[in-house]
C-alpha cells in the first residue's frame, strides 16, 4: 500500500487540484473566449457534476452505507443500482466535472489540462485501493459488478 492511498479525502483533492488550476491560470495566458458561452458551458457542467455527486451520496445514504472515502472497510452494503448502474464512482465523476467546469470558467487550456490529472490520481490512490477493500468485503458480488459497470463512465 502506497503512503498516499486513501489518505487525502477527495474533497481535499478537489481543493488542491482547483488551487493548482487557479495558480496556473494566474501565471499563464488565458484563451480569449466568449464569456456567455464559457459561463453557460461551465455552469451546465458544474450542475451535471453536482447531480452525479449528489445522486451517488443519496444512493449510499439510502442503503445506509458509509460515504467515508478514507475508510472503505466500513462499507456495510454493495450499492449496485441507481446511478451505480452507470458508474462505479459517480461521486468522483461529479468531482471531475466540477474541475472541468472550473477549467472552462478560467478559460485557460493549461489549467484545464490539470483537471484531467484528477482521474489519474483518483484511480491510483483512491479507487484501486477502495476496489481491493470492496472485493475483500463483498467477494464475487463485487467482481461481477466490476465486470458489468465501468469505473468512471
Q: What residue spans do the PLM features occupy?
A:
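Membrane-anchoring alpha-helices and their flanking helix-loop junctions
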Residues: 1-81, 93-153
Amino acid at each position: 500500500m502506497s503512503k498516499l492511498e486513501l489518505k487525502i479525502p477527495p474533497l481535499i483533492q478537489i481543493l488542491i487540484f482547483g488551487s493548482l488550476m487557479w495558480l496556473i491560470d494566474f501565471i499563464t495566458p488565458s484563451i480569449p473566449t466568449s464569456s456567455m458561452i464559457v459561463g453557460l458551458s461551465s455552469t451546465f457542467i458544474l450542475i451535471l457534476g453536482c447531480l452525479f455527486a449528489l445522486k451517488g451520496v443519496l444512493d449510499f445514504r439510502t442503503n445506509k452505507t458509509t460515504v467515508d472515502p478514507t475508510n472503505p472497510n466500513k462499507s456495510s452494503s454493495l450499492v449496485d443500482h441507481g446511478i451505480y448502474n452507470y458508474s462505479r464512482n459517480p461521486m468522483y465523476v461529479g468531482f471531475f466535472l466540477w474541475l472541468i467546469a472550473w477549467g472552462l470558467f478560467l478559460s485557460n487550456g493549461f489549467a484545464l489540462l490539470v483537471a484531467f490529472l484528477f482521474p489519474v490520481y483518483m484511480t491510483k490512490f483512491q479507487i484501486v485501493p477502495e476496489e481491493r477493500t470492496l472485493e475483500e468485503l463483498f467477494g464475487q458480488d463485487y467482481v461481477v459488478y466490476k465486470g458489468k459497470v465501468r469505473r468512471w463512465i
